[in-house]
């Protein structure tokens, strides 16, 4: 839910700045609108308000105050908080609003918020965000018949669907654990070979070395 709320706030800030910051009511309407959303939701004011508070706790949103403001309005601080560039924000926004997408889809849909020079720039931006610690996005396995693999955001505890986690880059601890297991396995094989060689020498009447 936080992803939909934050994505909506980012979208409205960039595409309709005259209507920004947003009241809870306008934010509910933005979250539940039919276009540029997948899936379409029916969030309530209470649900959206709760999500906004959780985002405030993380420093991603803040209460806007002004002389002409009678109803509380909220603004997002996501890019500022994480030190993101315009292209990164646009891609993450689309991923939060529509879910996993291919680079070509992202380039076309993010055009209203940021213009990418070409598809290669989109892919490079996604790759850079996937290499952060922790990663902000992850590339999913390419589906059968698909032109390209999809990318998914990893914000708010985002999880890779079952069977797709293998595409996540292994952590240092995972790599060290795998290396230790391989060393142990090789040591066991060497010990077995030494035992077999010792037994063969005994059969041949040779004195085995200690």
Q: Model regions: which residues?
A:
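Intrinsically disordered, low-complexity serine/threonine- and proline-rich regulatory segments
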Residues: 1-7, 14-18, 52-83
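A short, conserved structural fragment
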Residues: 49-66, 126-143
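Extended, charged alpha-helical interaction scaffolds
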Residues: 78, 84-123, 133-137, 142-143
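Amphipathic alpha-helical oligomerization/assembly segments
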Residues: 82, 172-208
């Amino acid at each position: 839910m936080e992803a939909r709320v934050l994505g909506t706030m980012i979208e409205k800030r960039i595409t309709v700045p005259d209507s920004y910051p947003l009241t809870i009511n306008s934010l509910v309407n933005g979250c539940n609108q039919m276009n540029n959303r997948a899936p379409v939701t029916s969030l309530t004011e209470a649900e959206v308000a709760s999500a906004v508070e959780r985002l405030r706790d993380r420093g991603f949103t803040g209460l806007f105050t002004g002389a002409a403001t009678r109803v509380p309005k909220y603004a997002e601080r996501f890019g500022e908080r994480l030190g993101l560039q315009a292209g990164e924000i646009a891609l993450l926004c689309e991923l939060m609003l529509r879910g996993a997408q291919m680079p070509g889809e992202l380039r076309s849909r993010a055009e209203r918020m940021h213009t990418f020079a070409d598809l290669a720039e989109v892919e490079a931006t996604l790759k850079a965000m996937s290499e952060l610690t922790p990663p902000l996005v992850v590339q999913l396995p390419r589906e059968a018949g698909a032109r390209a693999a999809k990318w998914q955001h990893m914000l708010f505890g985002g999880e890779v669907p079952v069977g797709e986690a293998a595409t996540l880059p292994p952590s240092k601890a995972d790599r060290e654990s795998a290396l230790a297991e391989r060393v142990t396995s090789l040591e066991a094989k060497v010990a077995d070979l030494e035992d077999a060689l010792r037994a063969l020498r005994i059969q041949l009447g040779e004195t085995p070395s200690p």
